[in-house]
């Protein structure tokens, strides 16, 4: 069975929950991105690429619900996992903060252009969305954007950059992802994994 896990904030929790479910995947000791452990194979990928790998043939993955929603990935999601909790929020400079309804014509910087557009469409507000890949909170500081849509955990990064959270767009947590074909061809193996992870969660992971 092949697993793909995200590098970054979800990696440790992903390894731990799989280990407690009886699947021990050793992280790579070098910069290699594929590790084989007996009958398991572990791939490491950028968080945004995990659902793509699962969609296109990797059996099982773990990714944040933010990434899955942003990509509109065609994967099965049998379980929400009890880690990686945060939120996707709209934030802007403290001194120029306004309500969502007052944001017509604003420029919004984000790694999540699809989720940002849907949010503003739901609110009937026309904005320009600028896609960036990192350091989103810098955009308002240098005049590239009026506001940002980004992941917020503690809010410390926002405060450090003079930003305030205006509105939560969605709660985010880690999700277990399963490839649709693998669910049929490896049903017993995957079903057993899902049941074991459910037990681990029930026991208070």
From Swiss-Prot:
<keyword id="KW-0368">Histidine biosynthesis</keyword>
<dbReference type="GO" id="GO:0005524">
    <property type="term" value="F:ATP binding"/>
</dbReference>
<dbReference type="Pfam" id="PF01634">
    <property type="entry name" value="HisG"/>
</dbReference>
<comment type="pathway">
    <text>Amino-acid biosynthesis; L-histidine biosynthesis; L-histidine from 5-phospho-alpha-D-ribose 1-diphosphate: step 1/9.</text>
</comment>
<dbReference type="InterPro" id="IPR018198">
    <property type="entry name" value="ATP_PRibTrfase_CS"/>
</dbReference>
<dbReference type="InterPro" id="IPR024893">
    <property type="entry name" value="ATP_PRibTrfase_HisG_short"/>
</dbReference>
<comment type="function">
    <text>Catalyzes the condensation of ATP and 5-phosphoribose 1-diphosphate to form N'-(5'-phosphoribosyl)-ATP (PR-ATP). Has a crucial role in the pathway because the rate of histidine biosynthesis seems to be controlled primarily by regulation of HisG enzymatic activity.</text>
</comment>
<comment type="similarity">
    <text>Belongs to the ATP phosphoribosyltransferase family. Short subfamily.</text>
</comment>
<keyword id="KW-0963">Cytoplasm</keyword>
<dbReference type="GO" id="GO:0003879">
    <property type="term" value="F:ATP phosphoribosyltransferase activity"/>
</dbReference>
<keyword id="KW-0547">Nucleotide-binding</keyword>
<keyword id="KW-0328">Glycosyltransferase</keyword>
<dbReference type="GO" id="GO:0000105">
    <property type="term" value="P:L-histidine biosynthetic process"/>
</dbReference>
<protein>
    <recommendedName>
        <fullName>ATP phosphoribosyltransferase</fullName>
        <ecNumber>2.4.2.17</ecNumber>
    </recommendedName>
</protein>
<dbReference type="GO" id="GO:0005737">
    <property type="term" value="C:cytoplasm"/>
</dbReference>
<keyword id="KW-0067">ATP-binding</keyword>
<dbReference type="InterPro" id="IPR013820">
    <property type="entry name" value="ATP_PRibTrfase_cat"/>
</dbReference>
<keyword id="KW-0028">Amino-acid biosynthesis</keyword>
<keyword id="KW-0808">Transferase</keyword>
<dbReference type="InterPro" id="IPR001348">
    <property type="entry name" value="ATP_PRibTrfase_HisG"/>
</dbReference>
